[in-house]
Amino acid sequence: MAKQKIRIRLKAYEHRILDQSADKIVETAKRTGAQISGPIPLPTERTIYTVIRSPHKFKKSREQFEMRTHKRLIDIVDPTPKTVDSLMKLDLPSGVDIEIKL
């Protein structure tokens, strides 16, 4: 029988909140007896918006805004039913996007 694996991808704009959430997931999975790989930092996605400062004139005067999306990857190898239940009950901050694949 092939080993079952749960892959969790986390995304957030704040890296501190993201790391705290990843630590909670790793701690919960280790406590329930599953093997963990990660958290693996993935490349940070940068989105830059350039806006003209003036409403009418002076096109050369511009302002740039940047939005960074930080990402982490956690693999849970051979999870137990207790691991899955505890991960479902886990309370994470609202600023973290979670994508789970079985």
Swiss-Prot record:
Matches recorded under InterPro entries: Ribosomal_uS10 (IPR001848), Ribosomal_uS10_CS (IPR018268), Ribosomal_uS10_dom (IPR027486), Ribosomal_uS10_dom_sf (IPR036838)
CC annotations in GO: ribonucleoprotein complex; ribosome
Record Gene3D superfamilies: Ribosomal protein S10 domain
GO molecular function, one term: tRNA binding
Keywords: Ribonucleoprotein, Ribosomal protein
Taxonomy, superkingdom: Bacteria
GO BP terms: translation
PANTHER family associated with the record: 30S RIBOSOMAL PROTEIN S10 FAMILY MEMBER (PTHR11700)
Self-association state and partner proteins as the record states: Part of the 30S ribosomal subunit.
Purpose of the protein: Involved in the binding of tRNA to the ribosomes.
Family note: Belongs to the universal ribosomal protein uS10 family.
Protein name per Swiss-Prot or TrEMBL: Small ribosomal subunit protein uS10
Organism in which the protein naturally occurs: Limosilactobacillus reuteri (strain DSM 20016) (Lactobacillus reuteri)
Gene designation: rpsJ
